[in-house]
């Protein structure tokens, strides 16, 4: 599961970029960024984001998800509750700290619309994160997954290696687009099926 957690975001990002490129929704830059430069930035991102995500995943999974599991709630309720609280926690960041131009670079919509779309995204992501936690009973695969999300996507956009066409950003935005979000949901539901089949075998 550790390897899966490490590979989820790079794999989904690669698929989304390739689909976007084939449909004209994504352009790969002609910039002369070397692999060495990208790997250097990637490693710096991994180091810094790893520390931040220890604290974040300690709250969302090690505490919140763990407490909700003790209440014997349905899977759907857990996904939605964790997704909602995780989403609402981002309210100050999106409504105050993010500039209009930064939001527009991700998705060409207004601030409030961007925030509301975020709930759908976090709800879908929470399926994946919740199921990884239930499979492993460990914080660390989640820290790894969350770190890779920040580390892989940010350099691609900041270094302008990948450019998403505004007219198709709703589909191919690497962080909130429909295509990657559906892929992350599929990953989460697949892990859920794996967990349930494993539990049946153990009964």
Question: Which residues make up each language-model segment?
Answer:
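Interfacial transmembrane-helix boundary/kink motif in multi-pass membrane proteins
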Residues: 1-18, 28-41, 66-81, 171, ...
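Membrane-interface interhelical connector segments
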Residues: 64, 94-111
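C-terminal membrane module of polytopic membrane proteins
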Residues: 135-137, 147-203
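Membrane-interface helix/loop boundary segments of multi-pass membrane proteins
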Residues: 55-88, 101, 134-138
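Alpha-helical transmembrane segments in multipass membrane proteins, preferentially the mid-helix core
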Residues: 121-135
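Membrane-interface helix termini and inter-helical loops of multi-pass transporters
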Residues: 21-33, 99-107, 158-168
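Aromatic-anchored segments of alpha-helical transmembrane domains
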Residues: 9-15, 84-93, 147-157
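Residue-level signature of the transmembrane alpha-helical core
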Residues: 6, 42, 46, 50, ...
């Amino acid at each position: 599961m550790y390897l899966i957690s490490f590979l989820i975001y790079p794999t989904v990002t690669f698929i989304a970029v390739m689909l976007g490129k084939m449909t004209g929704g994504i352009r790969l830059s002609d910039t002369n960024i070397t692999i060495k430069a990208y790997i250097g930035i990637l490693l710096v991102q991994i180091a810094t984001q790893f520390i931040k995500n220890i604290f974040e995943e300690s709250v969302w999974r090690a505490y919140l998800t763990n407490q909700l599991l003790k209440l014997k709630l349905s899977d759907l309720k857990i996904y939605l509750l964790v997704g909602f609280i995780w989403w609402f926690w981002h309210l100050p960041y999106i409504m105050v700290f993010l500039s209009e131009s930064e939001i527009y670079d991700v998705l060409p919509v207004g601030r409030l619309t961007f925030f509301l779309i975020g709930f759908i995204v976090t709800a879908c992501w929470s399926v994946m994160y919740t199921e990884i936690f239930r499979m492993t009973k460990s914080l660390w695969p989640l820290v790894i997954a969350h770190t890779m999300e920040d580390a892989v996507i940010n350099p691609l956009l900041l270094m302008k290696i990948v450019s998403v066409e505004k007219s198709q950003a709703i589909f191919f935005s690497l962080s909130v687009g429909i295509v990657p979000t559906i892929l992350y949901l599929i990953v989460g539901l697949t892990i859920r099926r794996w967990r349930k089949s494993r539990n049946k075998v153990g009964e």
